[in-house]
A protein has these predicted regions:
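Residues in the recognition helix of alpha-helical DNA-binding motifs
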Residues: 73
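A conserved regulatory-domain signal marking ACT and ACT-like small-molecule sensing domains
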Residues: 14-46, 76-178
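Short alpha-helical "recognition helix" segments of helix-turn-helix
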Residues: 59-60
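Short, intrinsically disordered or compositionally biased N-terminal tails of bacterial proteins
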Residues: 1-12
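Helix-turn-helix DNA-binding elements, focusing on the entry/boundary residues of the two helices
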Residues: 56
Length: 178
């Protein structure tokens, strides 16, 4: 199931989710962790990743919390229809950036000046497509959940000269890391 939302709806939705747990900083940390990692919740209130259940103790340990906080957060998610629908359908996607070099791919990390600005992905992809470079994966960190949002692009081939300079010259770009 795919849900297409306007940018303003997405920002509002994320804000609403975080706001829903504003009365509990510990549960808010759990929700943020679930969203950052693409983890969901099963019908019976267990944390899952693509249908594979994960022990609440493992999640709690990862965020420096307690299993009971994780369980209470999952229960609270299931009690609210909008949250229930989101977390029952959440899916994680593999990020191959850490193994890209072993696979012979090139990784470009773009740090934006302002991650909320539109057109960052399009501008970078345009530069790459102008050089007929094949993109294997694009991974964008959501600025609503990350203190250091970034655009990670994985290419099949090595970079020809001049490409990095063109990406660095884009007005949205603060830094490029290879």
């Amino acid at each position: 199931m795919y849900i297409y939302l306007r940018r303003s709806q997405c920002l509002s939705m994320w804000s609403d989710i975080i706001h829903e747990f504003g009365d509990s900083p510990s549960q808010s940390r759990v929700v943020r962790f679930l969203l950052e990692n693409g983890f969901g919740v099963t019908d019976d209130g267990r944390i899952s990743c693509n249908g594979i259940e994960m022990p609440a103790t493992a999640v709690a340990k990862a965020i420096g919390s307690d299993r009971r906080v994780v369980d209470a957060t999952a229960k609270r998610i299931l009690e609210r229809p909008m949250l229930r629908d989101i977390f029952l359908n959440m899916r994680a996607t593999p990020d191959i950036s850490r193994v890209a070099e072993s696979l012979g791919f090139t990784v470009i990390t773009v740090l934006p000046k302002n991650a909320n600005e539109r057109g960052i992905v399009g501008a970078a992809v345009r530069v790459l497509s102008d050089h007929q470079l094949a993109i294997r994966q694009i991974f964008v960190t959501d600025p609503q959940f990350s203190e250091d949002p970034k655009l990670v692009i994985i290419l099949e081939d090595p970079l020809p000269s001049g490409v990095i300079e063109k990406i660095r010259a884009l007005p949205q770009v603060r830094q490029v890391i290879i």
